[in-house]
Amino acid sequence: MRRTYPLRLTINGRSINQVIIDSHYEAKHSKTINDNLILELIKGLNGRTYEAESISAERWEIYVNDPLFLGEKPYRLVWCLHPDEDSVGVINAFRRSNGKVSK
């Protein structure tokens, strides 16, 4: 299930008007993260430019921020943009336990 939230941002020079959060994260991570925290993480992307990790055949640009900090807590955020859409999609998000972050 996906949930949509209105939110105005600029990411990679693109105007974003909404965030679509996939419920995938809830299967394993609902005790440490929720939609409100994810929206705060997404707000932290505002005004910045990122390089895509990959681009799908359907032209979805996949991004991974790891670590992405909210306060002093590290999170992993997997998100996507499409050149024809005005939304950012959140594929997955979770908090890194014990401060473990990938290098």
What are these regions (language model features)?
Residues 1-103:
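Ribonuclease/tRNase effector modules and their secretory precursors
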